[in-house]
Swiss-Prot record:
Protein name: U3-scytotoxin-Sth1a
MF terms (GO), sorted A to Z: ion channel regulator activity; toxin activity
Protein source organism: Scytodes thoracica (Spitting spider)
Function, in words: Probable insect neurotoxin with ion channel impairing activity. Does not show activity on 45 human receptors from 9 families (5-hydroxytryptamine, adrenergic, dopamine, muscarinic, histamine, neurotransmitter, opioid, sigma, and gaba(A) receptors). In vivo, does not cause paralytic or lethal activity when injected into sheep blowflies. When mixed with U3-SYTX-Sth1h does not cause paralytic or lethal activity when injected into crickets. It is noteworthy that both sheep blowflies and crickets are evolutionarily distant from prey species.
Propeptide residues, chain positions: 24-29
Amino acid sequence: MGFAKQFFFLAVLLSAAVMCSMAEPAQERLIESIACIQKGLPCMEHSDCCRGVCEALFCQ
């Protein structure tokens, strides 16, 4: 009985770790799509802009 509980606990921990590692990239993409900067506003990198073009510190 003790081994079965330990095995079940290990399986739950492993599946939780896998689910968290798969969810992080999706969460990052969602945040980037919500938090992107509109055309004409200041930016620092191409990834800051909704269309991905940052020229002369402004989204194009």
